[in-house]
Amino acid sequence: MKIKLPFWMDKGELSKIAVLFGKWWDYVLSAVKFPFNILDEEHCSERILNLIAYQRDVERFEGEPLELFRKRVKYAFLNAKDAGSKAGFIRIFERLGIGYVEIEERFDRENWDVIKIRISDSQLAKKTELLNLIIRKYGRTCRRYTFEVITKETVSIYHGEFNHDHQSFYVKVN
């Protein structure tokens, strides 16, 4: 913090005192911000992150990147709040960076407890453990989940105009 003095006071001992107060306020500000910075999930040390994760009941699965673990810890409360609804489940997938997801419920009359999750093949291949963890942690109890792979394919349709006359002749057979 730089303290700006009027031009007639900006010389000598007063300018030294202004610099001293600027440094002191920077120290006080850093001391006030320290508790908030130490609990920031995106920037804290990995040891503190593990303590926060324990507090929020988030376990790191094997081979999970640190950045994804930080996201899971950061959004643990929101994910728990959104669990159980179709729109909330889609928001969980978006927050954790999985991407576009479709969810269909009660599509079968006999197996009404099955929930179908439609995702792309690359999402399923790259994030299998994360998908299983999300379903196990935030999925509904007494429900079964299936994955259905959707593939994006570009289709070209050409159209044109075709003018013609049409006549029909009917014959009555006795």
From Swiss-Prot:
Induction: Expressed in the late phase of the viral replicative cycle. Keywords: Viral tail protein, Virion. It comes from the Viruses. Signal peptide: none annotated. It is found in: Virion. Belongs to the P2likevirus gpI protein family. Putative tail protein. This is Putative tail protein gp30. It comes from Haemophilus phage HP1 (strain HP1c1) (Bacteriophage HP1).
